[in-house]
Swiss-Prot record:
UniProt function note: Located on the platform of the 30S subunit, it bridges several disparate RNA helices of the 16S rRNA. Forms part of the Shine-Dalgarno cleft in the 70S ribosome.
Protein name: Small ribosomal subunit protein uS11
Name of encoding gene: rpsK
GO biological process, one term: translation
Family: Belongs to the universal ribosomal protein uS11 family.
Keywords of the record: Ribonucleoprotein, Ribosomal protein, RNA-binding, rRNA-binding
One of the record's GO cellular component terms: ribosome
Length: 127
């Protein structure tokens, strides 16, 4: 049987990009893109080995950000702009850990969507 030819993925060299941190109450998703918005690497708290209530901790967000950061460091990325979205507990720790990995963070922006009285929010918990 003939061997099927598969294209080897070309390693891209990108010097600066954007880190999108989506911090919900249950999970934190870190996506690192180039300037055009093409995804280079991503990681989540759940995918980093945390399950249940540990997924929503600042430490889990830190581990996810470091995991995504190491992947794009191999591509030669040095400068990052950080965009944070959501009210979750992993907001600051994920942004701080990207700085600790060795990136030069040029800008931190909060792009959390704020409704002009749109959908009804979830009811308050009675514990």
């Amino acid at each position: 049987m003939a061997k099927t030819s598969t294209k080897k993925r070309v390693k891209r060299v990108v010097s600066d990009g954007i880190a999108h941190i989506h911090a919900s109450f249950n999970n934190t998703i870190v996506t690192i893109t180039d300037r055009q918005g093409n995804t280079l690497a991503w990681a989540t708290s759940g995918g980093s080995g945390f399950r249940g209530s540990r997924k929503s901790t600042p430490f889990a967000a830190q581990v996810a950000a470091e995991k995504a950061g190491r992947i794009v460091q191999e591509m030669g990325m040095k400068n990052l702009e950080v965009r944070v979205k959501g009210p979750g507990p992993g907001r600051e720790s994920a942004a701080r850990s990207l700085n600790n990995v060795g990136f030069k963070v040029t800008n931190i922006a909060d792009i959390t969507p704020i409704p002009h009285n749109g959908c009804r929010p979830p009811k308050k918990r009675r514990v």
